[in-house]
Amino acid sequence: MIVKEGPASHSPFKLESLLIRLQSLDNNITGLGARFIHLIDAENELSEEHDQILSSILEYGPNWPFGAEEGFKIFSFPRFGTISPWSSKATDIAKVCGLDSVKRIERGIAFTIQLKDLNLEPKKGAIDLLHDRMTELAISELDQASEIFVTLEPKPSSTIDILSDGKNALEVANQELGLALNDEEMEYLLDQFLKLNRNPSDAELMMFAQANSEHCRHKVFNADWVIDGIEKEKSLFDMIKDTYVSSSKNVLSAYKDNAAVIAGDKADWFLPNLNDQEYGRFNDEIHTMMKVETHNHPTAISPYPGAATGSGGEIRDEAATGRGAMPKAGLTGFSVSHLFIPDDEQSWEETIGKPDHIASALEIMIDGPIGGAAYNNEFGRPNILGYFRTFEEKDREEKNTSWGFHKPIMIVGGMGNISDSSVNKNDIPAGSLIIVLGGPAMLIGLGGGSASSLNAGTSNSELDFASVQRDNAELERRAQEVIT
């Protein structure tokens, strides 16, 4: 393994902000430094020429100061057994530059923590702040990092023994996996698998829970409503669709795809020609595609990745509209409870506390907008508008009741273009192969649909944390290039 130090990983502002957060957890910390560090897995020792080429590839970024350079060392790397999107891109660049002996390049961050009392190590809570424990790990010895290049066997799927233990086995899996299945759904699954005379796998239950969650199926909004013994004519979704029913002129697609489409006009597209691999102008009818959705639960648990993946999911839905569309501009919006800004608290802000498993309104508004904007920027779509609102009020009649947005509303949306020939999906013949386009399938963010369907606080904090996806704008950009 070859090790090469890189540039500073944090801007001075970000480094100072991180230091303040660390000091709030451990008052023994006096300073912080951070720089990228590169690990290279090569088949043999590099020649002097190839070593110089590799060093030039790994010289990048602004010339920021490193911060503290002497002190307690912590190294943060992608979890062993995973390959980061940065790694795949850097390795490709090395291959193109003729470094055929380089098998893989991976990047981490070397943190230097200065301490008042050198006999004390930093507290675990402070170290946890330096990495995302879902996608990264922290080590104290650089020699341990060589394990990142070890290929691990995928963990096998397990089965839930309903043939022996019946519904009880499903109830245990429901709790442990955070599936949010109700009794009726568990009875349905039990009946179906007993008919098949086999046990379900954990993967099957996880997939069913997501596809059948309130987040995906909107069972409440599609349900029949009976109020005071009178069955209502329309569901909540029917009422939402009334706007389209009463004013559908120039609407080409609505409530049947990942995003809606309204009619546009003829214009020139600047697109690649698949025949000669060159860009050119193509005159076609260009329609407008639009989408808005929410990402409330993930943003409440972990604001930055919650808001970032909210934008990422909305971009994915736009791209998957019809037979492929092109996202162009985005929006983000936030509704939260009182902010309680330190040294600037307002007279109307009365504290009622908050659940431990969710972020505060201030944390959401510090990290959430940055997550949404950063993802849009990294994908290559400007985030051009949004809104921000705070509201929290005690009920004047019910003394123990308060209203507000402890679980925030986090809105993501956007607009883009789609060609006339791509507005509607074609029928898929039986037996067709399906390509799943994107990153590796890891247990990160799986369970978000079912977790968001639970009442806040009924899940445990680890399941809540695991249910938040992690952003990967670069990989989504690659997928978008395949689509358009």
Predicted feature residues:
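Core nucleic-acid recognition elements
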Residues: M1-T484
